[in-house]
From Swiss-Prot, chain B:
Alpha-D-mannopyranose binds at residues 168-170, 174, 182, 190-191. SUPFAM superfamilies: C-type lectin-like. One of its GO terms (cellular component) is plasma membrane. This is C-type lectin domain family 6 member A. GO terms for molecular function: calcium ion binding; carbohydrate binding; D-mannose binding; pattern recognition receptor activity. It comes from the Eukaryota. Residues 1-20 are cytoplasmic. Expressed by the XS52 DC (dendritic cell) line (at protein level). Expressed constitutively by the epidermis, and skin resident DC appear to be the major source of this expression. Expressed in the spleen and thymus. Expression was undetectable in non-DC lines, including macrophage lines (J774 and Raw), T-cell lines (7-17, HDK-1, and D10), B-cell hybridoma (5C5), a keratinocyte line (Pam 212), and a fibroblast line (NS01). GO terms for biological process: adaptive immune response; antifungal innate immune response; defense response to fungus; detection of yeast; innate immune response; positive regulation of canonical NF-kappaB signal transduction; positive regulation of cytokine production; positive regulation of intracellular signal transduction. The gene is Clec6a. The lineage of its organism: Eukaryota, Metazoa, Chordata, Craniata, Vertebrata. Associated with FCER1G. Heterodimer with CLEC4D; this heterodimer forms a pattern recognition receptor (PRR) against fungal infection. It is a single-pass type II membrane protein. Residues 86-203 form the C-type lectin domain. Keywords: Adaptive immunity, Calcium, Cell membrane, Disulfide bond, Glycoprotein, Immunity, Innate immunity, Lectin, Membrane, Metal-binding, Signal-anchor, Transmembrane, Transmembrane helix.
Length: 208, 209
């Protein structure tokens, strides 16, 4: 009787240990499998590839420049042909015909881009070097009501990075913005959204 | 006694079934894990990424053209700037005269090799870029001088196209090949001395994105 009991106990312990080992193995393998599936999925959904596919429908040529500083191991940055690269964006000036703000944004969208969002003085200086001082250009900024200015790509409106002309904005009913040249400098001017102007399109570079 | 036996038998069967299930689960998971690791490895070792990185050291800009026919879902074919695009290759006409081996070295330093001509259409495309008063090294040579011509990228010569000028090749000592314009046969190949100086044509495969 006494001998029997210890023997049974030992057997139970042994079985439990084996089962624990088996369960742990299965859990480990499951974790590894899920992890590697996630990694594979991330690679498949790699952003540049999707954007490359999208751009294929809008553009027939890309120009890629070697990046000195490697951005997460990407050594090339690309813009469509005839677009100008600056920082991490590409820019295009639409001068084929003037249009309202809505139409201008549509035209940018048809190129896989949006009306320009200006983040800094350097960026504005770069953009304005491409522009004709006699024309006005829609940018991707509008007043959604009560002087609440909003960028088209949801970039937070930063009062310290605004470049309004002196005395602007000056009319509550002028809810769209153009970049134009006044006297000696480029700056922003609020205008009616239905006015017809040129525009500047912007898209993120594609990194390879 | 009989009951005990039956009871023990049932227990053993039950345990075996559970163990079988556990082992099968582990095997399945192992297989899935290995398979997905292999797939991930394939993605990471993707040729375009590696070649893009290599080209980064030779060139400062690329031009990519939208390819109508999608080559395995890759929609863009890229060549370095100033290189000409045709089919699945990029070409650069070198305007410096050099020995054959130096010409090849110069191509290699750009991530390319001397041109290998695979079709008449390719030769026609190339010759449109050339100056009729000059001759250009091809990636074709006969190192042993025994008439066994070989392409520099190991394309089999015997199965490939040939565009020799009439009566060429004509000298065993001329172990390299240039493409040259002669009247009246126009563009064709001529065997030349490897240590004579000619212009050259570099070729590399496009990068598909």
């Amino acid at each position: 009787m006494m001998q029997e009991r210890p023997a049974q106990g030992q057997v139970v312990c042994w079985s439990l240990r084996l089962w624990m080992a088996a369960l742990i193995s299965i859990l480990l393998l499951s974790t590894c499998f899920i992890a590697s599936c996630v990694v594979t999925y991330q690679l498949m959904m790699n952003k540049p590839n999707r954007r490359l596919s999208e751009l294929h429908t809008y553009h027939s040529n890309l120009i890629c420049f070697s990046e000195g500083t490697t951005v997460s191991e990407k050594v090339w940055s690309c813009c469509p042909k005839d677009w100008k690269p600056f920082g991490s964006y590409c820019y295009f000036t639409s001068t084929d015909s003037r249009a309202s703000q809505n139409k201008s944004e549509e035209k940018c969208s048809l190129r896989g881009a949006h009306l320009v969002v200006i983040h800094s003085q350097e960026e504005q200086d770069f953009i304005t070097r491409m522009l004709d001082t006699a024309a006005g250009y829609f940018i991707g900024l509008s007043d959604v009501g009560n002087s609440q200015w909003r960028w088209i790509d949801q970039t937070p409106y930063n009062d310290r990075a605004t470049f309004w002309h002196k005395g602007e904005p000056n009319n509550d009913y002028e809810k769209c913005v153009i970049l134009n040249y006044r006297k000696t400098m480029w700056g922003w001017n609020d205008i009616d959204c239905s006015d017809e102007e040129n525009s500047v399109c912007q898209m993120k570079k594609i990194y390879l | 006694m009989v009951q005990e036996r039956q009871s023990q038998g049932k227990g053993v069967c039950w345990t075996l079934r559970l163990w079988s299930a556990a082992v099968i689960s582990m095997l399945l998971l192992s297989t899935c894990f290995i398979a997905s690791c292999v797939v991930t490895y394939q993605f990471i070792m993707d040729q375009p990424s590696r070649r893009l990185y290599e080209l980064h050291t030779y060139h400062s800009s690329l031009t990519c053209f939208s390819e109508g026919t999608m080559v395995s879902e890759k929609m863009w074919g890229c060549c370095p700037n100033h290189w000409k695009s045709f089919g699945s290759s990029c070409y650069l006409i070198s305007t410096k005269e050099n020995f054959w081996s130096t010409s090849e070295q110069n191509c290699v330093q750009m991530g390319a090799h001397l041109v290998v001509i695979n079709t008449e259409a390719e030769q026609n495309f190339i010759t449109q870029q050339l100056n009729e008063s000059l001759s250009y090294f091809l990636g074709l040579s006969d190192p042993q001088g025994n008439g066994k011509w070989q392409w520099i990228d190991d394309t089999p010569f015997s199965q490939n196209v040939r565009f020799w000028h009439p009566h060429e090749p004509n000298l065993p000592e001329e172990r390299c090949v240039s493409i040259v314009y002669w009247n009246p046969s126009k563009w064709g190949w001529n065997d030349v001395f490897c240590d004579s100086k000619h212009n050259s044509i570099c070729e590399m495969k496009k990068i598909y994105l």
